[in-house]
Amino acid sequence: MNVVILDTGCANLSSVKSAVARHGYTPVVSREAEIVLRADKLFLPGVGTAQAAMDQLRERELIDLIKACTQPVLGICLGMQLLGRRSEETRGVDLLNIIEQDVPKMTDFGLPLPHMGWNRVYPQAGNRLFQGIEDGAYFYFVHSYAMPVNPWTIAQCNYGEPFTAAVQKDNFFGVQFHPERSGAAGAQLLKNFLEM
């Protein structure tokens, strides 16, 4: 099976690569159109700011390539946010608009931002991405912006208020947490995605 990690220029690719390799796959890091489109599974990782990430995707001519994907795609952390319509970061950043939902800054409710550390995730019953993962399992988060709960939400988390921890629209999946840093639950989620 061809597993590709998209070289977005704004992610710690080695941790995702290692986590995938632990499941017996040999992922390829690439931004070449023919390799990406031939992938059976595609990872879209991202860290940092939405503006820097979108600039990198534009510069590397990856925006239309991502939108053309028909295989399962998993956005991780900022990679999930990039699937949205618009980030409220700085003066507003247009995103990939695969999921028609804006990504606002989280309200602090007296809690520290960024939201950093372990938190419980509550998936929709029966969702295949969370198969074999208990309701309320802990996952590791680092973020200050979050997609509100919306029609494409497949898992929620609460940090002062509910927000989208995972999303799905057609073949596009996204997780706000870092499965590669989330122990057994994260490993199971990656396994579920890889075996779809």
From Swiss-Prot:
Top-level division of the source organism's lineage: Bacteria
GO cellular component, one term: cytoplasm
Disulfide-bond pairs as recorded: none
InterPro entries to which the protein is assigned, alphabetical: Class_I_gatase-like, GATASE, Imidazole-glycPsynth_HisH
Pathway entry: Amino-acid biosynthesis; L-histidine biosynthesis; L-histidine from 5-phospho-alpha-D-ribose 1-diphosphate: step 5/9
Family matches, as Pfam families: GATase (PF00117)
UniProt xrefs under NCBIfam families: IMP_synth_hisH (TIGR01855)
Subunit structure: Heterodimer of HisH and HisF.
Function: IGPS catalyzes the conversion of PRFAR and glutamine to IGP, AICAR and glutamate. The HisH subunit catalyzes the hydrolysis of glutamine to glutamate and ammonia as part of the synthesis of IGP and AICAR. The resulting ammonia molecule is channeled to the active site of HisF.
Name the UniProt record assigns to this protein: Imidazole glycerol phosphate synthase subunit HisH
